[in-house]
Amino acid sequence: MTEYTTRAEWTGGHAGVLRCSNGPSFPFSAPEKLKGEAGVLTPEDAFVGSLNTCFMLMFIWAVERLKIGLVSYSCDATGFVEDRLDRTSRFGRLLLRPRIVARGCTREAVERALRLAEKYSLVWQSVNAVVELEPEITVAPD
């Protein structure tokens, strides 16, 4: 079984440093509106970002296997927080909006790559919220 580890170290206030097993470290804090610091990673950013980055990497993997000529890829991701009556909250929905420009393929091939990325994205498959995909696909002429 594969394992991924991190270590969170408190640095004072509502902040800390996240140390990842593959090397990088990131300062983090609560969001500014919750007594956090501006300009650093928040757990909420990391959650939405982990879905966005994992999905992108799996899309690149699928594009390579399907021999799609990828010209460009970018994706905006938004997490929608639901506030509950008991004063707790959760991400109820996440929305990915990838913008893809490909060449030398069909739109259907790009859509297949998107489906494969969804299926094989570890983070997507692990999320307990609804994840929606609204792609903007452009197939450029050869």
Q: Which stretches of residues belong to each language-model region?
A:
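Extended beta-strand/beta-hairpin segments
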Residues: 1-49, 57-142
